[in-house]
């Protein structure tokens, strides 16, 4: 009989745990029970030994009023030292002291968790019997040797009496304040607004810095109270015009992430706790994004995006469930007809989430062909703006557009300049280390050619947009000229007189390519960014300035007022036959044309179109002058200027213009074989803000890639306390009064990153202030005031996890900002 094997004994796994932590290999070397038991005899618990010997321990009266740093016990020798969140970091210094054997295992005397400095990770002591016995022994010794309340000396009794006197005085002062508050209307003063520290849950400074700024966003707290109300009834307009009554839905309670966020904001407003532990909120974030689990270095901007996107997804899910319940179907299996109905109601987007109502804005990308001056607009929503930060080296690499020529030398130069962008494609691991230099160079050149061809194909495909991939909105409006199209395709034009501003609409729909003269063709195209982007193609021509807005591309490809569309062999849909009978009165000037094609009353399900003209020169106009910020390269205004600068599309970036392609096919130089050749033209492109968000979040892209390496740009970027966004907004920016030429924002939060990419620390600057009533009315009720409200005064605080300190405004403006939080001044 052989002996039984004991090495292969497995440990039962607890299925209830979400993640299985790896076993630490340093438990045997980091534990010494004999030395630990000797050191714990007659010891003062929860006091740093080094701070005590350095005479840095304060009096007991001061000690009880202030928060103590966390104390960690070395499981090798019993040394007690303050944690890494304190100023001295004696526990970490004790580990770094060179010894023959490592003192790497420490035990927290606050929450009884074990940490290994070598692994830089938490150790589950339940996975090791020896470690579990040591932790249990230390906990028993700590509970036995701590003094009981009855065993107090006279000094402690005197301190308690002083405390009672102070508490009685505080109660009297509170009663006076309550009486004053009853007599006078309640006003939120900055002194009453509290700023509290957040416990570090293990390299979670990136999370704490963002949450400090969100806790100082009063609009978010007010809107979350409205979201949490049970039994909320919301009305959604029907997608079909035949259905006149809106759909009433009853929303369920919000999701777990939203509830955890609301609970966290309420805890931050309580006056009892000095330090808040956001464990529940962080665990909900980790459930949405597993990448934040563990104790690795993370990015605060990514955390903010995952947090906001997660709450927005929960709100959309609430609406979808409410629509299903309204149709009387609560089962998981749905038929196709009901699925299509739910999708149609969801596309209405009449219920924006609270995230979009606070942080949501809109960008408009304007592209104009230099030959036919056709303008197309693409609208994209955003929650924050990521701005480029140019260092001294990248600022010198400027390319002159006039000197660009189609030569092999320029192509090689372009490939060298684009090396940084292709660094993820050309990884070191792709080339074997054992090959010769000649083969390595050959492989690099081949990778460059493939990457360049791939980029060209993506750019060419990116200029065409698939009609069925765009989410659109019905937009019926009263216009100057109405044209009713019957089933035979006849058009009758009626003229009225309205100002030109009445025809420009602020809701955008569509994905219709350019309408030129009597015939037009809609190309099926691909949008590489978002399938739900709303695209507004404003087709402005010098001959017949027309703009087409489609309300439902999927339906218009099937039936356009009785004119069925033909589908080409390559999948493209031609609707030129549907517009052959569309004739305009020659007596009318192009600047006075505005046609609305209404659906026939006898044909249910047909869609609404409108054709509106606009001056192409105003497409690139802004609310205010922007050239002033081109000189100051070290300011946030210059970063916004670079983000919204006017670009020229040349050479490989040329625009595929449908109008010019159509003209060439119909012109004298048309191909005799009937083949249709695409025409690529030079164009101008600019991206501007078309919807100013109530809370503006700016992200400075300091972490950049240089070749195969990653680096951080430590350049100081100046940012003002009052920011005017008007130079970067479109001329017809929404949420801005007509006569206002300023879009002002006030700074209230900064996230700063100090250190390097490998080892850094996030801190926050937050401004405790009174709530902006005009901003609350805009978010809650949609009211846009005519006059500006004065900037709310307050006190700035610097928060580093649990450490909170009041600072002047100059220190805030001199910080190395990574995230900036601005609120709208209305």
From Swiss-Prot:
<dbReference type="GO" id="GO:0045944">
    <property type="term" value="P:positive regulation of transcription by RNA polymerase II"/>
</dbReference>
<dbReference type="GO" id="GO:0035520">
    <property type="term" value="P:monoubiquitinated protein deubiquitination"/>
</dbReference>
<dbReference type="InterPro" id="IPR001394">
    <property type="entry name" value="Peptidase_C19_UCH"/>
</dbReference>
<feature type="binding site">
    <location>
        <position position="82"/>
    </location>
    <ligand>
        <name>Zn(2+) 2</name>
    </ligand>
</feature>
<dbReference type="GO" id="GO:0006508">
    <property type="term" value="P:proteolysis"/>
</dbReference>
<feature type="binding site">
    <location>
        <position position="116"/>
    </location>
    <ligand>
        <name>Zn(2+) 1</name>
    </ligand>
</feature>
<feature type="binding site">
    <location>
        <position position="26"/>
    </location>
    <ligand>
        <name>Zn(2+) 1</name>
    </ligand>
</feature>
<keyword id="KW-0131">Cell cycle</keyword>
<dbReference type="InterPro" id="IPR050164">
    <property type="entry name" value="Peptidase_C19"/>
</dbReference>
<feature type="binding site">
    <location>
        <position position="74"/>
    </location>
    <ligand>
        <name>Zn(2+) 3</name>
    </ligand>
</feature>
<comment type="function">
    <text>Specifically deubiquitinates 'Lys-120' of histone H2A (H2AK119Ub), a specific tag for epigenetic transcriptional repression, thereby acting as a coactivator. Deubiquitination of histone H2A is a prerequisite for subsequent phosphorylation at 'Ser-11' of histone H3 (H3S10ph), and is required for chromosome segregation when cells enter into mitosis. In resting B- and T-lymphocytes, phosphorylation by AURKB leads to enhance its activity, thereby maintaining transcription in resting lymphocytes. Regulates Hox gene expression via histone H2A deubiquitination. Prefers nucleosomal substrates.</text>
</comment>
<dbReference type="GO" id="GO:0005634">
    <property type="term" value="C:nucleus"/>
</dbReference>
<feature type="binding site">
    <location>
        <position position="51"/>
    </location>
    <ligand>
        <name>Zn(2+) 2</name>
    </ligand>
</feature>
<feature type="modified residue" description="Phosphoserine">
    <location>
        <position position="552"/>
    </location>
</feature>
<dbReference type="InterPro" id="IPR001607">
    <property type="entry name" value="Znf_UBP"/>
</dbReference>
<keyword id="KW-0804">Transcription</keyword>
<feature type="binding site">
    <location>
        <position position="103"/>
    </location>
    <ligand>
        <name>Zn(2+) 3</name>
    </ligand>
</feature>
<feature type="binding site">
    <location>
        <position position="24"/>
    </location>
    <ligand>
        <name>Zn(2+) 1</name>
    </ligand>
</feature>
<dbReference type="GO" id="GO:0043024">
    <property type="term" value="F:ribosomal small subunit binding"/>
</dbReference>
<feature type="active site" description="Proton acceptor">
    <location>
        <position position="761"/>
    </location>
</feature>
<dbReference type="GO" id="GO:0043130">
    <property type="term" value="F:ubiquitin binding"/>
</dbReference>
<feature type="compositionally biased region" description="Basic and acidic residues">
    <location>
        <begin position="394"/>
        <end position="408"/>
    </location>
</feature>
<feature type="binding site">
    <location>
        <position position="90"/>
    </location>
    <ligand>
        <name>Zn(2+) 2</name>
    </ligand>
</feature>
<dbReference type="GO" id="GO:0051726">
    <property type="term" value="P:regulation of cell cycle"/>
</dbReference>
<feature type="compositionally biased region" description="Basic and acidic residues">
    <location>
        <begin position="421"/>
        <end position="430"/>
    </location>
</feature>
<dbReference type="InterPro" id="IPR030849">
    <property type="entry name" value="UBP16"/>
</dbReference>
<feature type="binding site">
    <location>
        <position position="94"/>
    </location>
    <ligand>
        <name>Zn(2+) 3</name>
    </ligand>
</feature>
<feature type="modified residue" description="Phosphoserine">
    <location>
        <position position="189"/>
    </location>
</feature>
<dbReference type="GO" id="GO:0006357">
    <property type="term" value="P:regulation of transcription by RNA polymerase II"/>
</dbReference>
<keyword id="KW-0010">Activator</keyword>
<keyword id="KW-0156">Chromatin regulator</keyword>
<keyword id="KW-0805">Transcription regulation</keyword>
<dbReference type="InterPro" id="IPR038765">
    <property type="entry name" value="Papain-like_cys_pep_sf"/>
</dbReference>
<dbReference type="GO" id="GO:0140950">
    <property type="term" value="F:histone H2A deubiquitinase activity"/>
</dbReference>
<keyword id="KW-0378">Hydrolase</keyword>
<feature type="binding site">
    <location>
        <position position="48"/>
    </location>
    <ligand>
        <name>Zn(2+) 2</name>
    </ligand>
</feature>
<protein>
    <recommendedName>
        <fullName>Ubiquitin carboxyl-terminal hydrolase 16</fullName>
        <ecNumber>3.4.19.12</ecNumber>
    </recommendedName>
</protein>
<keyword id="KW-1017">Isopeptide bond</keyword>
<comment type="similarity">
    <text>Belongs to the peptidase C19 family. USP16 subfamily.</text>
</comment>
<feature type="modified residue" description="Phosphoserine">
    <location>
        <position position="415"/>
    </location>
</feature>
<feature type="binding site">
    <location>
        <position position="119"/>
    </location>
    <ligand>
        <name>Zn(2+) 1</name>
    </ligand>
</feature>
<dbReference type="GO" id="GO:0003713">
    <property type="term" value="F:transcription coactivator activity"/>
</dbReference>
